[in-house]
Structures are given as structure tokens and as C-alpha cells.
């Protein structure tokens, strides 16, 4: 089961979140049938949103949009504070690797664009923030958002490793944030440790990558685990929700579906589930509108 572990240094000078998001990203790949680069880009966005959602309280709903002008198009993710996340990528078929190493490429195919977050607190006044894409690698773009928009300097690591068949092998990440009151000496020490950390891809390849991440972040610094919470890819779409959407259409459009297509098929963008509405279903909706 996927999870996020929240921890804090014994000194109270900084905190860290580490995540195992393997099942989340694997299910997203299965739902959308994504190829290598698209899988990694979508996976990193889902992990970023899992971190962002874990930072919220109450019943907030968090939307992350990575909007580029190159091959991937838009990547959209929605998460809640209960550990659920869903998402999709416009172009599922990007599959580009370095010839020499086989490394999956992401940044060069994101292009210029923006990292957009929408936090809906359920009050009717969602908070929206937009920051530019810095590298298109998503992790750096997320860190820039946290620094610029939330005024919280953060170190972020996100990645998805694929097997020889380009299926998700492991996915996860971390966030480290300095807390108010940390001394300059403590900040310098943590910055040095982060600079010396192995690459996130190397840590994820460890047998127990969650423990490997924590060990790399804290070293011999005492820390305590605050909580361990489950994470999952879960879509909240339903037939009732799409039926309500059909109710908003003009009668003429619904009648055209009956006359021309003998019904309607609606596919959820986030999970690919198909919902069929036959002629009788559409006629009932038309009658309900009357």
C-alpha cells in the first residue's frame, strides 16, 4: 500500500515528508495506457499533488495543472486530504529516451508554461496560484511554487522508475522544509546534507526506498515520525455525476444524440471509465428537464 510518512527533526528545525507512490502511479499508467515519458510526467505530477494535499487541513480539494506548450500538453491532477488522487495527461504517447543511457526524458518535452494550483477549501472562494515552469521536470517547478507562492523554501525530489517493459517499477518522492526558528548553522547543515544526497532515482532503487529517503535526509540527526497515512489513486466519478452534466445540456442537443447516435457514451478523463446512456436514458433526462 502506498503511504506518506511525515517526520520532524528532534530539534524542530525542519520537517520532511517521504512517499511511496508506486501503486498510485502504476494504476494511473494502467488507466491511461501511457508510454514512458508520459508515465513519468503524469506520475511526478500525482506525487507533487499528494505532497501538496498532505499539507492541507480539513476537507480541502487541491488541483494541480502543469500546463506546457510542447509534447505533453496539459497534465491535470486533483487530490483530497484523505490521501486520494486522480489525474490525466493530454498526450499519453510521449516515449523518448536518451540513446546512451535509456533515461526517460521529461523536461525538454514540457516546454514553456505554468504550474497552477487551485486549493478549494469548500467556502466558495478557492485560492489560485500560478508560477512559471522553471525546468519542466515538475519537481523543480513544484519547489519553485512552494518558495514563491507559499513563501516556504523547500527541497523536492520526485521520480518514477520504469522496468525493462516501461511499466512502473517504483515511484515516490520527498519534501524537506526548514521551519521557523531554525538557526543559520542548522540551515547550513541541512543544505549541505541535501546537496550531498544521492540522486532521487538512486534512492528509489533501494530495497526499502522509504527508509533510504529518511536516512539520506536526516543522516545521524535524531528525528521522529509524526504519522504514516495511506495514499491511493482513486477517482470519484459516477454515473449520477455525468447524468447531472447531461441535464445541463439543451433539449435539442440531447435529442440530437438520440437521433444521430442512438445514445451517448461519456468517458471520464481522469480514470477512463465509460458510461453508456441509451435512448431511453436520454429521453428520461429530456422529460425530467420538462
UniProtKB/Swiss-Prot annotation:
* Keyword terms: Chaperone, Cytoplasm, Disulfide bond, Redox-active center, Zinc
Modifications the protein undergoes after translation, according to the UniProt entry: Under oxidizing conditions two disulfide bonds are formed involving the reactive cysteines. Under reducing conditions zinc is bound to the reactive cysteines and the protein is inactive.
Q: Which cysteines are joined by disulfide bonds?
A: 235-237, 268-271
Cellular component terms per the entry's GO annotation: cytoplasm
Question: What biological process terms from GO does the record include?
Answer: protein refolding
| Recorded superkingdom | Bacteria
What are the protein's GO molecular function terms?
Answer: protein folding chaperone; unfolded protein binding
The protein's matches in CDD domains, at most eight in alphabetical order, are given as: Hsp33
Q: Where in the cell is it found?
A: Cytoplasm
Query: Where mainly located?
Result: cytoplasm
- Family to which this protein belongs: Belongs to the HSP33 family.
Q: Briefly, what is this protein's role?
A: Redox regulated molecular chaperone. Protects both thermally unfolding and oxidatively damaged proteins from irreversible aggregation. Plays an important role in the bacterial defense system toward oxidative stress.
Protein name stated in the entry? 33 kDa chaperonin
